[in-house]
Amino acid sequence: MAANYSSTSTRREHVKVKTGSQPGFLERLSETWGGMFVGLMAFLLSFYLIFTNEGRALKTATSLAEGLSLVVSPDSIHSVAPENEGRLVHIIGALRTSKLLSDPNYGVHLPAVKLRRHVEMYQWVETEESREYTEDEQVKKETRYSYNTEWRSEIINSKNFDREIGHKNPSAMAVESFTATAPFVQIGRFFLSSGLIDKVDNFKSLSLSKLEDPHVDIIRRGDFFYHSENPKYPEVGDLRVSFSYAGLSGDDPDLGPAHVVTVIARQRGDQLVPFSTKSGDTLLLLHHGDFSAEEVFHRELRSNSMKTWGLRAAGWMAMFMGLNLMTRILYTLVDWFPVFRDLVNIGLKAFAFCVATSLTLLTVAAGWLFYRPLWALLIAGLALVPIIVARTRVPAKKLE
């Protein structure tokens, strides 16, 4: 298979050096204007991210509180209770599918909700390391290109390499990755909707120790099938295939007991479908394991809180970086004076930190204003603290 491509060898590398003149003041000023535009976009985007995140977080929290107050647990999962029609139900049980999932090309068959085939190709990979330095009043950029062979699941286009000769990769894989999904999945008498099936994602590696080599040109080593003449010494273009599964259906002597999940959804006949809340959100929850309704909602609230704080931090960082780029022009104007330049740089970063913090808190308060006005006013008050502290320090310095 690999005869038409570059043969595998030891790590290779080469170095390129580009020389250019030091950028003048106008050139650096022009680059700063481009950075200011990028900074402005990041600054504006941060407001949208922070504001919409607060609305999403409060909407989710309200929906979860509503769901917790309405959820009911049926007496049995093996019968459909008519009195629960349209209600939010809490179901615990083992997953069950109607048929085996299989990949006949490799002799893999098992009862599960999902079966994933993962294909990797042995390919050349280019890594690039650059450094800039000044020599004889010229700016030089040294770039070191290194080439090594690795197993990769995506095609690496060797035409984009700095030096393709001797490092050519195939343009396609003879075998592709895929995921097979059971069309019907049940818990007792209840059928899971497609949204719940998508949430079954606890993939586990499938051991191939009890499987035979499916074809004479495929060799099994460990938990991989190799399309290779010698798996110990692979060539560029060789393939290796592994399998994983999610949601084991029924007890299996080799794979273990059936996978148990906890589902909270709306009962519609014998189906479990999304539940619409008064706030306009939907509840369709699946957790791996056996949990009470209270535990599920507590886990969801904790997840919502972590996501909210993560997006707040991302919004603050976007605002901070945007302000840094927007004020960079002031640094460029004084970068001829080393001492003054360093002081200005520290001052600009402190300014960006204070403004980003204040504006983030104000934006959070604006997002909360639609749901909890009192909390919004409190946060707005806290947002003014850095500004008040900064203003009180100025008169103190004047008195000195």
From Swiss-Prot:
Single annotated GO MF: identical protein binding
Coiled-coil parts of chain: none
Compartments reported by the entry: Endoplasmic reticulum membrane; Nucleus inner membrane; Cell membrane
Membrane topology value: Multi-pass membrane protein
Topological domains, Perinuclear space: 53-313, 367-368
Entries under InterPro entries matching the protein: TMEM43_fam
Chief localisation class: endoplasmic reticulum
Keywords: Acetylation, Cell membrane, Endoplasmic reticulum, Immunity, Innate immunity, Membrane, Nucleus, Transmembrane, Transmembrane helix
GO cellular component, one term: endoplasmic reticulum membrane
N-acetylalanine: residues carrying this PTM: A2
Keyword Mitochondrion attached: no
Cystine bridges: none
Transmembrane segments: 32-52, 314-334, 346-366, 369-389
Nuclear side: 2-31, 335-345, 390-400
GO BP terms, alphabetized: innate immune response; lipid metabolic process; nuclear membrane organization
Keyword Membrane: yes
Sequence similarity: Belongs to the TMEM43 family.
Primary role: May have an important role in maintaining nuclear envelope structure by organizing protein complexes at the inner nuclear membrane. Required for retaining emerin at the inner nuclear membrane. Plays a role in the modulation of innate immune signaling through the cGAS-STING pathway by interacting with RNF26. In addition, functions as a critical signaling component in mediating NF-kappa-B activation by acting downstream of EGFR and upstream of CARD10. Contributes to passive conductance current in cochlear glia-like supporting cells, mediated by gap junctions and necessary for hearing.
Subunit organization: Can form oligomers through the transmembrane domains. Interacts with EMD; the interaction retains EMD at the inner nuclear membrane. Interacts with LMNA and LMNB2. Interacts with SUN2. Interacts with RNF26; this interaction is important to modulate innate immune signaling through the cGAS-STING pathway. Interacts with CARD10. Interacts with gap junctions proteins GJB2/Cx26 and GJB4/Cx30.
Protein name (Swiss-Prot/TrEMBL): Transmembrane protein 43
